[in-house]
Structure formats: structure tokens, C-alpha cells
Regions:
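Flexible, solvent-exposed loop segments that connect beta-strands
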Residues: 72-86, 114-135, 164-184
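Residues that define the transmembrane beta-barrel architecture of outer-membrane proteins
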Residues: 37-39, 49-53, 83-89, 102, ...
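Outer-membrane beta-barrel "beta-signal"
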Residues: 95-96, 185-200
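Membrane-embedded beta-strand positions of outer-membrane beta-barrel proteins
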Residues: 41-43, 57, 69-71, 91, ...
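Feature captures outer-membrane beta-barrel proteins of Gram-negative bacteria and organelles
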Residues: 29-32, 53-68, 88-97
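Repeated loop/turn-to-beta-strand initiation elements of outer-membrane beta-barrel proteins
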Residues: 64-67, 101, 149-153
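Cleavable N-terminal export/targeting peptides
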Residues: 1-34, 199-200
Length: 200
């Protein structure tokens, strides 16, 4: 009889666990369906690490669809003729696999910006000074973790294309103009580790 009683107890415990777990999941789903965030602001910590102030907003369009728009601006000049002066706007349409502002998403983004960079060899162009603009598009994947009702964290990475059109100058103030060039870039176009505050 003892083994039969133990088996019955195990079955009852398992059934109770499944009942509680299922009820909890159902309540969570109901809560998420009645309250999905609609609007959030964010900032990318990785851009701040390059001394680039930045801010983004994200707006809910449907249960699994959002529009993210980020912008950054860097006016600084450093020593040894180094500078990464630029502004950039990057809108992105996101499709969420679970629900918006939660879990995995795929994105389609565009970008446009103007730059005045020197002695950095970005995009593999060399160490001269480059004054011009860029535009293009890409795809991305990201994941968002909910920390609390108002706070979240997000990691994202994207690849794509950028067309650069620029005037090339010798390094230094008043450097000689060396020509006008274009450059087609394929590679990473988006990377982020962002902190998010949900407004509503």
C-alpha cells in the first residue's frame, strides 16, 4: 500500500503544481494583454562610452509591432587631430516574436547622418579628415528584458549597407582638400545596450 500512497501523493502534488503554474501563466498572459506598453524613451550606453550623447523613443503600433527612432550627436574634438563629430538618425520598424517591449525582435532600419571625422580610420577609409554624409539600411536582431513595470534593458545588433559621400582633407586645421570620394560600406550598422523607461 505504501508505494501506491506515495504514487498518489506525487500525482496530486504534480497536478497541484500544474494547476498553480497554469493559473499563474494565464494571469500573466491576461495582464500582458490588458496592458502593453505604448511609449518608451531610451538611451544607448555604448554610444555614451564613445562620448556620444543619444536618445531614442519607441512607439507601439500593434501587439507585435513597434517603431523605434534613435538619434545621436557628437560635437567633440580630441587631441592629436582626433574627432568623431557627427549626427545620426536611425528609425527602425520592429517585429516582436512574443509581444512588443518583451523578448526577441527583428528589425528593419534605415540611417542618415552627417560626419566630420579625423584620424580614426572608421569604415576603413584611413586617417585623414572626412566631411560628408552617409545613408543606408540594414536588418537587426535584439532582445529586451523587463526589469520592472517602468524599466527595461535591451541588447541589439544589426548589419547592413551605408553609402558615404565625403570631401577628403589632409589632417589638421585648414588641411588641404584632397578630393571628393564615395565609399560603399557593408557590415555592422547598429549595436546597442540600452536602458529603457516606459512612459505609458
Amino acid at each position: 500500500l505504501y508505494p501506491n500512497k506515495m504514487r498518489t501523493i506525487k500525482i496530486l502534488l504534480a497536478a497541484g503544481f500544474l494547476l498553480v503554474f497554469g493559473t499563474s501563466i494565464h494571469a500573466q498572459v491576461q495582464r500582458n494583454e490588458t496592458y502593453l506598453p505604448k511609449f518608451a524613451i531610451k538611451t544607448n550606453a555604448l554610444y555614451w562610452a564613445t562620448s556620444t550623447p543619444n536618445l531614442g523613443i519607441e512607439v507601439g503600433l500593434a501587439k507585435k509591432l513597434t517603431l523605434d527612432i534613435s538619434g545621436n550627436y557628437n560635437p567633440w574634438k580630441f587631441g592629436d587631430d582626433r574627432q568623431i563629430k557627427h549626427w545620426l538618425v536611425q528609425p527602425e520598424l520592429r517585429y516582436w516574436l512574443c509581444e512588443r517591449f518583451n523578448g526577441s525582435f527583428f528589425g528593419l532600419h534605415g540611417h542618415y547622418g552627417e560626419m566630420n571625422v579625423s584620424n580614426l580610420n572608421i569604415f576603413g577609409m584611413g586617417h585623414d579628415r572626412y566631411d560628408g554624409n552617409l545613408y543606408g539600411a540594414g536588418i537587426s536582431y535584439g532582445y529586451q528584458w523587463i526589469i520592472s513595470k517602468r524599466w527595461s534593458m535591451e541588447a541589439t545588433i544589426g548589419v547592413g549597407y551605408a553609402r558615404l559621400e565625403y570631401d577628403k582633407y589632409a589632417r589638421g586645421d585648414g588641411g588641404e582638400k584632397l578630393g571628393h570620394n564615395t565609399h560603399n560600406y557593408f557590415g555592422p550598422t547598429k549595436i546597442g545596450l540600452s536602458f529603457i523607461y516606459v512612459i505609458k
